[in-house]
Curated annotation (Swiss-Prot):
UniProt protein name: Probable pyruvoyl-dependent arginine decarboxylase
Cross-referenced Pfam families: PvlArgDC
Catalytic activity: L-arginine + H(+) = agmatine + CO2
EC number: 4.1.1.19
Amino acid sequence: MSFVPTKVFFTKGVGRHKEYLSSFELALRDAKIEKCNLVTVSSIFPPKCERISVEEGIKLLTPGQITFAVMARNSTNEYNRLMAASIGVAIPADDTQYGYLSEHHPFGEDEEQSGEYAEDLAATMLATTLGIEFDPNKDWDEREGIYKMSGKIINSYNITQSAEGENGLWTTVISCAVLLP
């Protein structure tokens, strides 16, 4: 049986609770995907896959449904510890080719830093598969320009959730690309 997703939506959430597992559940609720049995998959953005809104995507979910997702997840119970969970996205100009989704789950990075890093990861993975020449030592802004000017990468972006740990509680952050039939 072959299953290639035709739709994707991006969501994120944060949860806090005295129990680790419950903080994850609350992050799933915040992201509006708690009713699914999530199966994490690796990082390919399928050819011809349409991005839809969270609201549209939620309507397509059924409680208990086996749902595939690329998920970045991070947790801490340390007071004031900054963490993030980011999904980076890179989409080729040719929609018959696949793109990339990257996961990044750091400590000590805010949303902007983490998101930019995840986006860079996805775009660099795509650039290397497309044969785009670039200097890996250049900063992201320079490489982003090279990638997009090549005409082979049409878009890159990220979805990121960050939070700081609260005293006495587990804090969990998630970012997900939810893949649908």
